[in-house]
Amino acid sequence: MLGSQTKQVILGIDPGTATMGWGVVRQEGSRLRYVQHGAITTPSGWGMPRRLDRLFAGVTELIRGYRPSAVAVEELFFNTNVTTAITVGQARGVALLAAYRAGVEVFEYTPLQVKQAITSYGRADKRQVQEMVRALLGLRSIPRPDDAADGLAIAICHAFSHRMSAATGVGKPRAMQDN
């Protein structure tokens, strides 16, 4: 295990244009502490530019308020609905841009990696992941909305991945590079 010198605040983001879930955890050595969770929502009647602007402003505000040392974002997974994949990709882009502009390092995790880190089973269902998020953070109930629980799961995934790579020097989380 790591010593108590490892401290970081992690913002996890589950991208979406209607609802962007987020969760903040604090890692202190081998301990993980719940900070907050929520969702940035946009009205369905808004055009895409206005929705993306709201998401960008919301993520920027979260970064200013919580001052994370890392932002973990769920990678886009293959989706048979091309329109959904495109809009989720746009929301991801907004989150990545907000973190980049704030100078915060960004890490990406696939849904499989998140499930594996949280439940030790890459094919876990949504309810299993949510229940483990609740248990790992010592919460009385499963965080709502679902997107916010996913944001917390992504933040926890980063904390676990970061802790393991720091302890072993192997399998470092993939940070996005500024090339």
UniProtKB/Swiss-Prot annotation:
The organism's place on the tree of life at top rank: Bacteria
Q: What is the lineage of its organism?
A: Bacteria, Bacillati, Actinomycetota, Rubrobacteria, Rubrobacterales
Binding annotation for Mg(2+) 1: 14, 147
Write down the InterPro entries for this protein, in alphabetical order: RNaseH-like_sf, RNaseH_sf, X-over_junc_endoDNase_RuvC
> Which Gene Ontology MF annotations are present?
crossover junction DNA endonuclease activity; DNA binding; magnesium ion binding
Q: What is its EC number?
A: 3.1.21.10
One Gene Ontology biological process: DNA recombination
Keywords assigned: Cytoplasm, DNA damage, DNA recombination, DNA repair, DNA-binding, Endonuclease, Hydrolase, Magnesium, Metal-binding, Nuclease
In terms of one coarse class, where is the protein primarily found? cytoplasm
| Cofactor annotation | Mg(2+)
Quote the cofactor binding remark: Binds 2 Mg(2+) ion per subunit.
Subcellular localization(s) per the UniProt record: Cytoplasm
- What's the subunit arrangement here? Homodimer which binds Holliday junction (HJ) DNA. The HJ becomes 2-fold symmetrical on binding to RuvC with unstacked arms; it has a different conformation from HJ DNA in complex with RuvA. In the full resolvosome a probable DNA-RuvA(4)-RuvB(12)-RuvC(2) complex forms which resolves the HJ.
Function comment: The RuvA-RuvB-RuvC complex processes Holliday junction (HJ) DNA during genetic recombination and DNA repair. Endonuclease that resolves HJ intermediates. Cleaves cruciform DNA by making single-stranded nicks across the HJ at symmetrical positions within the homologous arms, yielding a 5'-phosphate and a 3'-hydroxyl group; requires a central core of homology in the junction. The consensus cleavage sequence is 5'-(A/T)TT(C/G)-3'. Cleavage occurs on the 3'-side of the TT dinucleotide at the point of strand exchange.
The family annotation for this protein states: Belongs to the RuvC family.
Sites binding Mg(2+) 2 sit at 74
Catalytic reaction(s) noted: Endonucleolytic cleavage at a junction such as a reciprocal single-stranded crossover between two homologous DNA duplexes (Holliday junction)
List, alphabetically, the GO terms of the cellular component aspect: cytoplasm; Holliday junction resolvase complex
Q: What is this protein called?
A: Crossover junction endodeoxyribonuclease RuvC
- Entry annotation: catalytic residues: 14, 74, 147
What PANTHER family would the database entry show?
CROSSOVER JUNCTION ENDODEOXYRIBONUCLEASE RUVC
